[in-house]
């Protein structure tokens, strides 16, 4: 199980990303709009740089919802491979069956 501090840090980042999503999207639209003047685009770039670092979605890490494990996480389930196997064998993950061919 991951340290609780790491799990809490990731949750804090998710909240910041959600909080600044609209502002970040608006600034990104200004920055990529080539019809605007260079000064306007530069000002938007400065405002983007002034946003909190953790408000960027690229800093998020997918973690297992049960254990907090950062690696081997399946997006479809939000669980790490260990927990998927464990829960699937117990029949607790709907739609997952052992492969047979």
UniProtKB/Swiss-Prot annotation:
PROSITE patterns: RIBOSOMAL_S14 (PS00527). GO terms for cellular component: cytoplasm; small ribosomal subunit. One of its GO terms (biological process) is translation. Gene3D superfamilies: 1.10.287.1480. It comes from the Bacteria. InterPro entries: Ribosomal_uS14, Ribosomal_uS14_bac/plastid, Ribosomal_uS14_CS. SUPFAM superfamilies: Glucocorticoid receptor-like (DNA-binding domain). Coiled coil: none annotated. Keywords: Ribonucleoprotein, Ribosomal protein, RNA-binding, rRNA-binding. One of its GO terms (molecular function) is rRNA binding. Belongs to the universal ribosomal protein uS14 family. Part of the 30S ribosomal subunit. Contacts proteins S3 and S10. Binds 16S rRNA, required for the assembly of 30S particles and may also be responsible for determining the conformation of the 16S rRNA at the A site. This is Small ribosomal subunit protein uS14. It comes from Dechloromonas aromatica (strain RCB).
């Amino acid at each position: 199980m991951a340290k609780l501090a790491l799990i809490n840090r990731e949750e804090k980042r998710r909240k910041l990303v959600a909080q600044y999503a609209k502002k970040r999207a608006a600034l990104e639209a200004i920055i990529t709009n080539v019809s605007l003047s260079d000064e306007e685009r530069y000002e938007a770039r400065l405002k983007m740089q002034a946003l909190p670092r953790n408000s960027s979605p690229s800093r998020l890490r997918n973690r297992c919802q049960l254990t907090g494990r950062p690696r081997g996480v399946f997006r479809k389930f939000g669980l790490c491979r260990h927990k998927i196997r464990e829960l699937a064998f117990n029949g607790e993950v709907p739609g997952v069956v052992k492969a047979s061919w």
